[in-house]
Regions:
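Electropositive, glycine- and tryptophan-enriched low-complexity nucleic-acid-binding patches
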Residues: 1-41
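A residue-level signal for conserved active-site and pocket-lining positions in enzyme catalytic cores
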Residues: 7, 99, 128
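Loop/helix-junction capping segments adjacent to catalytic residues or to phosphate/diphosphate-binding pockets
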Residues: 20-23, 57-58, 122
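Catalytic-loop motifs flanking and including active-site residues across diverse enzymes
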Residues: 22-25, 97, 124-127
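Helix-centered, glycine/charged polyanion-binding patches within enzymatic domains
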Residues: 38, 43-118
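Charged phosphate-binding loop/patch that engages nucleotide di/tri-phosphates or the phosphate backbone
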Residues: 125-138
């Protein structure tokens, strides 16, 4: 999920099988999400991205740089090396808005169960929840 700084969802990825980690097809997934945001006439130049250590890959950091996305990604200590990347711990604390949005989504029991086997139904349930979240914020 990509949210704005208030936690309002802007884009959602397609469902990914549970046996994959966060970084599986990450660049392709985020690129598709960014294109969806741009189709809505929302500018993504200079987009600021907070992400946890699960998204700390060289390929994803390069993607962010190429697409003028300012990344603030916690370093994954399991990668075995400390890169020369800037990381702002104060700004990283703002990442809670995405976690809060995830908690809001968990309030929708149809999504929480996650046994939906039809991809279109899963996506539709998420988009419906996003609409409710947006309406609550207005």
């Amino acid at each position: 999920i990509i949210t704005d700084n208030k936690g309002i969802p802007l884009s959602c990825s397609d469902p990914i099988a549970g046996n994959h980690n966060d970084a599986h097809d990450l660049v392709k997934t985020v690129d598709k999400m960014i294109l969806n945001i741009q189709k809505s006439d929302i500018l993504t130049d200079g987009l600021f991205l907070n992400a946890d250590a699960g998204f700390d890959t060289t390929e994803f950091r390069s993607y962010c740089f190429r697409n003028d996305i300012i990344d603030n990604i916690d370093q994954n200590k399991r990668n075995g090396h400390q890169g020369d990347y800037s990381f702002d711990t104060l700004l990283y604390k703002c990442r809670f808005v995405v976690e809060r949005t995830n908690a809001w989504l968990d309030a929708f029991k149809a999504i929480l169960v996650r046994f939906e086997t039809n991809e279109i139904h899963w996506k539709a349930l998420n988009l419906l929840a996003f609409c409710v979240i947006l309406l609550r914020q207005l």
